[in-house]
Amino acid sequence: MAIRVPSRQLFIDGEWREPIKKNRIPIINPSTEEIIGDIPAATAEDVELAVAAARRALKRNKGEDWASASGAHRAKYLRAIAAKITEKKDYFAKLEAMDCGKPLDEAARDIDDVAGCFEYYADQAEALDAKQKAPIALPMDTFKCHVLKQPIGVVGLISPWNYPLLMATWKVAPALAAGCSAVLKPSELASVTCLELAEVCREVGLPPGVLNILTGLGPEAGGPLACHPDVDKVAFTGSTATGSKVMSSAAQLVKPVTLELGGKSPIVIFEDVDLDKAAEWTAFGCFWTNGQICSATSRLLVHESIAAEFLDRLVKWCKNIKISDPFEEGCRLGPVVSKSQYEKVLKFISTAKSEGATILCGGSRPEHLKKGYYVEPTIISDVSTSMQIWREEVFGPVLCQKTFGSEDEAIELANDTQYGLGAAVLSKDLDRCERITKALEVGAVWVNCSQPCFTQAPWGGTKRSGFGRELGEWGIENYLNIKQVTRDTSTDEPWGWYKSP
């Protein structure tokens, strides 16, 4: 059952603050097309306030309140946040489903992962204490050297709408664990749960300014945040086009960035698979999260000897997916996030048709849903490598398909993309899977599955899918500066390079 969406302001310096220009943006429920609330629209003036608050949080009490405090001290806050989110799991899941159209069961799993991510980085914060002053072996006995890991400073975090709170947490949790202070700018298409994260931070007593949350449009809030001279690093998840702009802005100040961008990931199906198991993983890999996954395995490569039988089986699986209001029991496919995204997805499908491709199933609005931005799970065959549907990211429930005859051809087709986020290979021959895994030009490979993601494992891409790694121990390293400290251990002996005066 839907719930009321709370009305919030911007979260700056531990307080709710009205945007300086007092503007707000309507929230549209993508399953009903109705306005269910609004969010504050931050601008450059609000960014100034938030960045200043974050800088003060770093310096307060000479850093002892946060940046220079022990990892164990910060871990207590992260665990408190995790506990509070777990306590409010149903509330957060319902808000997520209303805001972005995610099936309620999926949203609930996401909230579990949010709490788990804060718990994991609480552990990482504590582990950071033990890693401080790690000794470095030197070839000279008269010197001792060790390494300090210190927070990089104020970080700007820009997160997407497909996993609104979870992808924000992928950035917030490690940044706070490292001792950074942060300004989070979630997507204006799905900001509600990020604002509720602010309320959780207020409830657990997170020091003012450690986490500031600004909602608003990209050009008006995200742009000023990315290029702000007092922001020491930017982490961005979103489209490749926007990521390029973020990188350009940061480059003017030689500011480090982490980018997780678009994808057009392949799933390679060999002739020895169990057809039903492979069909379900293929559907899940492309249609989970309503097809709006940066790593969606949306290019299906299937061995020519089983292609006809496999596609027939896959179509049956896809037609059996329950498409409904996200709150309906058993929903497995909800609407895409917005009207513009809905129109974009349908345009991709119509362009594929006009270029000569065949729609095996789906391709339009489900007949039983007259309102909402719903698109049927769509499978497109007779695709050439020059077609738009093969080359460009759709970000919707659309799968395109080609066949291959050999392992080498499969690898060539799989790597035929500007992107390199993820890939899947399905075969009972694990030696073959290992060969394919090594040859794929991506940041993550799934063997005999597609899309499982764990907080403990690194996440990121190659090529135009970005660079840097989130999650795992790599996630916290994103927000740390490494400082070498070398000490002369000789007693009163001079260095001896210059002649004594």
From Swiss-Prot:
The keyword Plastid applies. Keywords: Chloroplast, NAD, Oxidoreductase, Plastid, Transit peptide. It is found in: Plastid, Chloroplast. GO terms for biological process: cellular detoxification of aldehyde; glycine betaine biosynthetic process from choline. The active site is at E260, C294. Residues 1-7 form a transit peptide. GO terms for cellular component: chloroplast. Pathway: Amine and polyamine biosynthesis; betaine biosynthesis via choline pathway; betaine from betaine aldehyde: step 1/1. Its EC number is 1.2.1.8. The record marks N162 as: Transition state stabilizer. InterPro entries: Ald_DH/histidinol_DH (IPR016161), Ald_DH_C (IPR016163), Ald_DH_CS_CYS (IPR016160), Ald_DH_CS_GLU (IPR029510), Ald_DH_N (IPR016162), Aldehyde_DH_dom (IPR015590). CDD domains: ALDH_F10_BADH. It comes from the Eukaryota. One of its GO terms (molecular function) is aminobutyraldehyde dehydrogenase (NAD+) activity. NAD(+) binds at G238, S239, T240, A241, T242, G243. It catalyses: betaine aldehyde + NAD(+) + H2O = glycine betaine + NADH + 2 H(+). Homodimer. Belongs to the aldehyde dehydrogenase family. This is Betaine aldehyde dehydrogenase, chloroplastic. It comes from Amaranthus hypochondriacus (Prince-of-Wales feather). The lineage of its organism: Eukaryota, Viridiplantae, Streptophyta, Embryophyta, Tracheophyta.
